[in-house]
């Protein structure tokens, strides 16, 4: 079996790292080649502020790790926290830094959402734990608090897919990270139109 050279980028809540993996046909060896801090930043508006991921800096750190690996990488996998996302406009440009799941804008959104869609139905469709950091509640808050910006959005990409898009130009929605959103129909393994409509994105 031919040798394989792989990279894994792991973005945690406070730090990130890039790990190089080599498979020689018999065994795998792993080496951490780049580590970096991951600290949120605050974006200030006229009336509100939001805690965000410093996405462009994190993307630069990802590129540094790729460069350190050399030019013989066969594949790369990207792992991040769930639920958070970036908004793209019609031209595919990132509208703003992705908001951090620790931002307080979703406080009370579970109660507001329950007035639009019954929680028993929501759980039956998604099987997801009820947490106000879930993408479903984040999108409801986005639509309420940053209505103009939300109105310019053409597409939502979850964070691993957003990094992948910046690397490759390809837009995808990988299933396992999408399953953290509370937007998926667990039985059909596809987006739930009822929930998307309730979130105002369908």
List the model feature ranges, each with a label:
Residues 1-96, 124, 152:
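N-terminal glycine/serine-rich phosphate-binding loop of ATP-dependent small-molecule kinases
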Residues 99:
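Surface "functional belts" at beta-alpha junctions
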């Amino acid at each position: 079996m031919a040798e394989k050279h792989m990279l894994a980028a792991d973005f945690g809540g406070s730090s990130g790292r890039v790990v190089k993996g080599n498979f020689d046909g018999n065994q795998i060896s792993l080496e951490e080649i780049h580590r970096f801090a991951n600290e949120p930043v605050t974006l200030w508006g006229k009336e509100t502020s939001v805690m965000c991921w410093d996405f462009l800096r994190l993307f630069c750190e990802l590129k540094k790790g790729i460069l350190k690996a050399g030019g013989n990488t066969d594949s790369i996998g990207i792992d991040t926290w769930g639920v958070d996302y970036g908004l793209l406009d019609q031209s595919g440009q990132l509208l703003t830094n992705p908001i951090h799941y620790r931002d307080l804008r979703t406080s009370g959104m579970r109660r507001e959402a329950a007035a639009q869609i019954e929680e028993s139905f929501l759980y039956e469709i998604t099987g997801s734990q009820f947490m106000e950091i879930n993408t479903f509640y984040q999108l409801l808050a986005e639509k309420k608090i940053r209505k103009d910006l939300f109105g310019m959005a053409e597409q939502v990409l979850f964070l691993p897919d957003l990094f992948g898009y910046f690397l490759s130009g390809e837009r995808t929605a990988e299933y396992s990270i999408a399953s953290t959103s509370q937007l998926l129909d667990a039985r059909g393994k596809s987006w739930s139109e009822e929930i998307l409509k309730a979130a105002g994105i369908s």
